[in-house]
Amino acid sequence: MISRKTITDIARKIADSLNPEKIILFGSYAWGKPDKDSDLDLFVIMESTERPIKRAASIRRILKDGYVPMDILVRTPEELRHRINIGDPFIKKILRDGQVIYARDSA
């Protein structure tokens, strides 16, 4: 199992390196009961010109020090708005039921 401290540390590393708009925890650690086989699911909202798969790879490189099994989805604010506008049920569930573990100050 992945501790809450480890999840917070991962979010802090991502935030310190990439300054995302928001990091949302979803999946079993956010809305279920994680077990020993559960991975960490993160939805990261940030500006980027890279392709989505490369964005996730960039985050994995930042987190290379400690291995935690995880799935990382990275979308730009524009991509997120588009997915919401077309009614993407998966994105809606993440936004509705996920836990925001980092939000950049807008000030």
Describe these PLM feature segments.
Residues 28:
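Conserved H-loop
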Residues 1-22, 31-36, 47-107:
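Catalytic core of pol beta-like nucleotidyltransferases
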Residues 43-45:
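Short hydrophobic/aromatic beta-strand micro-patches
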Residues 38-40:
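Short, conserved active-site loops that position catalytic residues or coordinate cofactors/metal ions
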